[in-house]
């Protein structure tokens, strides 16, 4: 079951959430109830969320509540299901790999020649590939975009350079490494195999938005766990309020 809770920015949503978590903790282990509760938050928010949990739950520790990021949950599930055989490459490793690729492909680039030593360009390319993958834009989708642009258009030439870099990057990691975005996709496809997930009640908080990959994870968790609860920030008077 999926439950959505939303409120205005000025409301104490953490207080509400931890009160609901407290109620669920009281039912841990009862027939039909979860055995544990996982609170999923953004990577950079895990420490603050733990502090908030100690404060709102008024306890020195908790056994049945675990606060973790989606990437950490992915690692747990893939370790359990045996889906993490390839070496994980993070954004820093991808930065180095992209720098190597851009230098090697310099003669084949039209617009971005000589950019292999530019940290800002490599960072931009790193972030762009990450976003393309998060939004399920693969090489074929990127090629379709390029085909819609007029010949000799500067934007088209830029896209063709990005396509070449993206293609070489995929070739370099294929079968050897797995990046964060593909790691998350692999996680989503293994959730149904996890005996860990089926006994967990999930709470999700602290996210401003969800990428398609994250939405797929939420769908799989909803189908295969004791339930998913999402806490959102929304102004009920906003033009988008009706989607909730």
Locations of regions flagged by a protein language model:
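Glycine-rich P-loop/Walker A and Walker A-like loops and their local beta1-loop-alpha1 context
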Residues: 1-54
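Accessory N-terminal region flanking or inserted into the helicase ATPase core
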Residues: 1-5, 13, 104-206, 213, ...
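Structural motif
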Residues: 6-10, 41-45, 204-212, 233-235
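Hydrophobic helix-cap positions at the C-terminus of alpha-helices
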Residues: 20-28, 57, 190-194, 220-224
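A general structural motif
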Residues: 32-36, 197-200, 225-227
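Conserved P-loop NTPase-based nucleic-acid remodeling module centered on helicase motor cores
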Residues: 33-144, 150-153
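Conserved helicase core region in the C-terminal RecA-like lobe
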Residues: 66-72, 201-210, 214, 229
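Conserved RecA-like helicase ATPase core segment
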Residues: 213-244
């Amino acid at each position: 079951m999926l439950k959505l809770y939303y409120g205005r920015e000025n409301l104490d949503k953490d207080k509400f959430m931890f009160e609901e978590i407290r109620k669920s903790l009281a039912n841990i282990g009862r027939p039909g109830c979860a055995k544990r509760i996982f609170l999923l938050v953004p990577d950079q928010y895990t420490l603050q969320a733990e502090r908030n949990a100690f404060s709102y739950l008024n306890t020195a520790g908790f056994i049945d509540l675990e606060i973790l990021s989606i990437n950490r949950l992915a690692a747990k599930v893939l370790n359990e299901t045996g889906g993490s055989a390839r070496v994980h490459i993070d954004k820093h490793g991808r930065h180095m790999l992209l720098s190597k690729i851009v230098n090697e492909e310099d003669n084949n680039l039209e617009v971005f020649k000589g950019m292999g030593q530019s940290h800002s360009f490599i960072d931009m390319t790193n972030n762009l590939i990450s976003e393309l993958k998060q939004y399920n834009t693969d090489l074929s989708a990127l090629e379709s975009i390029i085909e819609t642009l007029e010949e000799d258009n500067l934007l088209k030439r830029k896209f063709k350079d990005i396509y070449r870099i993206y293609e070489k990057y995929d070739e370099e990691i294929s079968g050897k490494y797995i990046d964060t975005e593909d790691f998350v996709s692999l996680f989503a496809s293994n959730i149904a195999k996890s005996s860990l997930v089926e006994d967990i009640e999930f709470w999700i908080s602290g996210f401003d938005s969800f990428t398609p990959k994250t939405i797929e994870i939420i769908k799989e968790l909803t189908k295969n766990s004791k339930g998913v609860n999402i806490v959102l920030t929304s102004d009920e008077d906003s033009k988008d309020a009706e989607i909730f």
